[in-house]
């Protein structure tokens, strides 16, 4: 397999096919149970109307509708009304309806299973939120899939993109614990595609293990030059997963639309935020994130109940355990900087522990939030926004 072939396929897919994908459609998974936290959805648009072609004989039936919903919407600006059709004898029917592209056999039989579906469903019932930062933040839950039906000896690329669910901007109403429409969406962010770092690879390699997009990061920095996915905060997005067959033919760009297949799992849609809004989402992330062990070691009653930006009931519990209070071996005071503090000084020192000060008490010299656990060489980044006042982008959780 030549590098030029892979490059051609990537360019053809990105420039031709992906640009014409719509937010709706794909090969969706089963809808998640429970009520939608964003309220009732808008009714689906009516099915397209197919008018008979002007060149067809009188009385001849027009083109039949497709047997199932075609996964991709027409490109932006494409003519959809009958008035835009060419007129006169011999006019083409192409403007009236675009026939579905027959998929290459290498991708037609591919199927995908979403991993951790039960967890995604649980988040979806609450209204999933994903943190976006200037530096980029990984998703949790991580998007992971299991693949079936690939040609073991064929080469495939796996990639993801994110499309807006609607044209609205949202805000969270804390008094009602619900999301409300705040207005029209902000201008669209630059569309980007995230290729799995193992792409391209043989079908046998993709199918033998779970495929994880744990390197994918979300950012709200419009000038990002690190290749992260750029999203608008307080907007809803739908992740999409694409399987692309690496066609060895020299003119493979001609077959770009038939060489890929898209999968959409509605339970993975989320709202991009800079700090968690729903405290139940915060609790569920703490309970289910393997890198949040330090938070789970505390009493669940210490978890934030009435969440608001800057609230710090959870971190305060840990900070108090590290404050310079009197111990049995030091009944009359506490050592600080080589001398003993009297009880009054201890009380004054403790009273100055504002939320920002408490975070500094918990953060070691390496910028790692120390929750009393051994700090490994590489701490997994963990989002403390919405939990910790005075947080910094470098905070990590041990």
Swiss-Prot record:
**What highest taxon heads this organism's lineage?**
Eukaryota
Entries under Pfam families matching the protein? T-box
A Gene Ontology biological process in which this protein takes part is: enamel mineralization
GO CC terms? chromatin; nucleus
Localization recorded for this chain is:
Nucleus
- Where is this protein primarily located? nucleus
Regions of compositional bias (Pro residues) in chain numbering: 40-50, 60-69
Please list where the region (Disordered) is annotated: 23-72
The answer to keyword Transcription applying to this record is yes
**Where are the compositionally biased (Low complexity) regions?**
29-38
Instruction: Summarize which parts of the chain are annotated to bind DNA, as ranges.
Output: 119-297
Oligomeric form and interacting partners: Binds DNA as a dimer. Interacts with DSCR6. Interacts with NKX2-5.
Please describe what this protein does: Transcription factor that plays a key role in cardiovascular development by promoting pharyngeal arch segmentation during embryonic development. Also involved in craniofacial muscle development. Together with NKX2-5, acts as a regulator of asymmetric cardiac morphogenesis by promoting expression of PITX2. Acts upstream of TBX1 for the formation of the thymus and parathyroid glands from the third pharyngeal pouch. Required for hair follicle stem cell self-renewal. Binds to the palindromic T site 5'-TTCACACCTAGGTGTGAA-3' DNA sequence.
Recorded disease: Haploinsufficiency of the TBX1 gene is responsible for most of the physical malformations present in DiGeorge syndrome (DGS) and velocardiofacial syndrome (VCFS). DGS is characterized by the association of several malformations: hypoplastic thymus and parathyroid glands, congenital conotruncal cardiopathy, and a subtle but characteristic facial dysmorphology. VCFS is marked by the association of congenital conotruncal heart defects, cleft palate or velar insufficiency, facial dysmorpholgy and learning difficulties. DiGeorge syndrome: A congenital syndrome characterized by a wide spectrum of characteristics including parathyroid hypoplasia resulting in hypocalcemia, thymic hypoplasia resulting in T-cell immunodeficiency, defects in the outflow tract of the heart, and craniofacial anomalies. Disturbance of cervical neural crest migration into the derivatives of the pharyngeal arches and pouches can account for the phenotype.
Q: What is this protein called?
A: T-box transcription factor TBX1
Organism, by scientific name, is: Homo sapiens (Human)
According to the entry, what is the taxonomic lineage of the organism? Answer: Eukaryota, Metazoa, Chordata, Craniata, Vertebrata
Q: Which gene encodes it?
A: TBX1
């Amino acid at each position: 397999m030549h590098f030029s072939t892979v490059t051609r396929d990537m360019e053809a897919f990105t420039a031709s096919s992906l640009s014409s994908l719509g937010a709706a459609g794909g090969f969706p998974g089963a809808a998640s149970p429970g009520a939608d936290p964003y309220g009732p959805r808008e009714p689906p648009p009516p099915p397209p109307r197919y008018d008979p072609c002007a060149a067809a004989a009188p009385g001849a039936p027009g083109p039949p509708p497709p047997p199932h919903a075609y996964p991709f919407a027409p490109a932006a600006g494409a003519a959809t009304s009958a008035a835009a059709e060419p007129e006169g004898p011999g006019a083409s029917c192409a403007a009236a309806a675009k026939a579905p592209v027959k998929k290459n056999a290498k991708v037609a039989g591919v199927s995908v299973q979403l991993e951790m579906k039960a967890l995604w469903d649980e988040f979806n019932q609450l209204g999933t939120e994903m943190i976006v930062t200037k530096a980029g933040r990984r998703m949790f839950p991580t998007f992971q899939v299991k693949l079936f039906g690939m040609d073991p000896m064929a080469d495939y690329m796996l990639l993801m993109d994110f499309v807006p669910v609607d044209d609205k901007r949202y805000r969270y109403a804390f008094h009602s614990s619900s999301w409300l429409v705040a207005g029209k969406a902000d201008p669209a962010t630059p569309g980007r595609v995230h290729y799995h770092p193992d792409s391209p690879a043989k079908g046998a390699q993709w199918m033998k293990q779970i495929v994880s997009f744990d390197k994918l990061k979300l950012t709200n920095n419009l000038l990002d030059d690190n290749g992260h996915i750029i999203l608008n905060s307080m907007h809803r997005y739908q992740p999409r997963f694409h399987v692309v067959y690496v066609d060895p033919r020299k003119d493979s760009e001609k077959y770009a639309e038939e060489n890929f297949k898209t999968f959409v799992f509605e339970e993975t849609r989320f709202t991009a935020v800079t700090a968690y809004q729903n405290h139940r989402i915060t609790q569920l992330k703490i309970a289910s994130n393997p890198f949040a062990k330090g938070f789970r070691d505390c009493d669940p009653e210490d978890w934030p109940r009435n969440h608001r930006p800057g609230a710090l009931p959870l971190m305060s519990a840990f900070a108090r355990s590290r404050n310079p209070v009197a111990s049995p071996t030091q009944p009359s005071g506490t050592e600080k900087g080589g001398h003993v503090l009297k009880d009054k000084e201890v009380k004054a020192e403790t009273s100055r522990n504002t939320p920002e000060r408490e975070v500094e008490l918990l953060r070691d010299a390496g910028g790692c939030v120390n929750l009393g656990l051994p700090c490994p060489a590489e701490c997994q980044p963990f989002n403390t926004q919405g939990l910790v006042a005075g947080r910094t982008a470098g905070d990590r959780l041990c």
